[in-house]
Amino acid sequence: MAPQQQPSSIPTPYEDLLREILETGTPKGDRTGTGTTSLFGRQIRYDLSAGFPLITTKSVHVKSVVGELLWFLRGDSNVRWLQENGIRIWNEWADENGDLGPVYGVQWRSWPTPNGQHIDQIAGALETLQTNPDSRRNIVSAWNVSELDNMALPPCHLLFQLYVANGKLSCQLYQRSADMFLGVPFNIASYSLLTHMFAQQAGLEVGEFIWTGGDCHIYDNHVEQVKLQLSRDARPYPQLKLNKAADMFSYDFSDIEFTGYDPHPVIKAKVAV
C-alpha cells in the first residue's frame, strides 16, 4: 500500500496521481521489459499564477529542464549542445554521432511539408496568440507519423494547445506515455516554462498548465522511490523570474531563475530505455 497522504494546504496533484496509480493501477508489461503499474487517461492542473510547479517532494534538476527546452526551441536534434551544457538526459537514445533523428525540436521548428517547405510551429503559435488569440486551432504537434520510424524515440509528450481567456494564457499538454517518477516532473516544469515564455512574448498573463496523460505508469523498479517521495510533505512552490528575450528563440539560461526552490533531497532511479 502507498503511504497515507499528509494534510497540506499546498496543492499536490502530481503526488496525488502517483498515489492513485500505486493503489489502483493495473500491472502491465512494457516495451523496455521492466514492468509497470499503470492507469489510463488522467489529468492534473496547476494555476501558474500561484507559483511555478517545480516538484518539491524530491529535487528536480532545474538546469536539465531549462536546457532541454532551450534545445527544443533551437530546433536541434543532436545531443552535442546538451552535453556542452552538462546535460546528459538524452545520451541513452543518441547514435554514435549524437543524433536522435527528427525529434521534438525538429518538428516544432521545421515540420516538413510535401512541397519541400518547412513549418515553424512555434513561430506560428506565437503569431496566432498575437493576431487571433481566440483561435481553437493553436496546436503544436511533435507526432509526425511519416517520420516516427526515423526518430530515436517517438514523442512521449506529443501535442500541446494554447488557450487565451481574460488576458491569461493556458496550455494543455497531451502525453501518450508518462513515466510518472522520472519523466513527468520534467515535463510539467518544461511546459509550464514554455507557457510563461509564450505569455511574455504575447503580452499576456499566465493562466493554467493542464497535463493530460494517456498511459500513466510507475515502473516496477521505481516503486520504492515513489513510496519514499510520498512520505514527504510538499513544500511551497518556487517563483519564476523570467527576463524578456527579444523573441521566443533568444532565451538563455541567464534569463531564467527560480527563487525559493527548497525541495526535499534527490531520489535516484534508473531510466527505462
Swiss-Prot record:
EC number: 2.1.1.45
GO CC, alphabetical: cytosol
InterPro entries in UniProt: Thymidate_synth/dCMP_Mease, Thymidate_synth/dCMP_Mease_dom, Thymidate_synth/dCMP_Mease_sf, Thymidylate_synthase, Thymidylate_synthase_AS
CDD domains tied to this protein: TS_Pyrimidine_HMase
Lineage: superkingdom: Bacteria
GO molecular function: thymidylate synthase activity
Binding-site residues, dUMP: 31, 136-137, 176-179, 187, 217-219
Principal location: cytoplasm
Binding site for (6R)-5,10-methylene-5,6,7,8-tetrahydrofolate: 61, 179, 272
Subcellular localization(s) per the UniProt record: Cytoplasm
GO biological process per UniProt: dTMP biosynthetic process; dTTP biosynthetic process; methylation
Record key words, sorted: Cytoplasm, Methyltransferase, Nucleotide biosynthesis, Transferase
Annotated active site: 156 (nucleophile)
Catalytic reaction annotation: dUMP + (6R)-5,10-methylene-5,6,7,8-tetrahydrofolate = 7,8-dihydrofolate + dTMP
SUPFAM superfamilies associated with the record: Thymidylate synthase/dCMP hydroxymethylase
Pathway assigned to this chain's UniProt record: Pyrimidine metabolism; dTTP biosynthesis
Assembly and binders: Homodimer.
Job of this protein: Catalyzes the reductive methylation of 2'-deoxyuridine-5'-monophosphate (dUMP) to 2'-deoxythymidine-5'-monophosphate (dTMP) while utilizing 5,10-methylenetetrahydrofolate (mTHF) as the methyl donor and reductant in the reaction, yielding dihydrofolate (DHF) as a by-product. This enzymatic reaction provides an intracellular de novo source of dTMP, an essential precursor for DNA biosynthesis.
Recorded family membership: Belongs to the thymidylate synthase family. Bacterial-type ThyA subfamily.
Protein name as annotated: Thymidylate synthase
Organism expressing this protein natively: Corynebacterium jeikeium (strain K411)
Originating gene: thyA
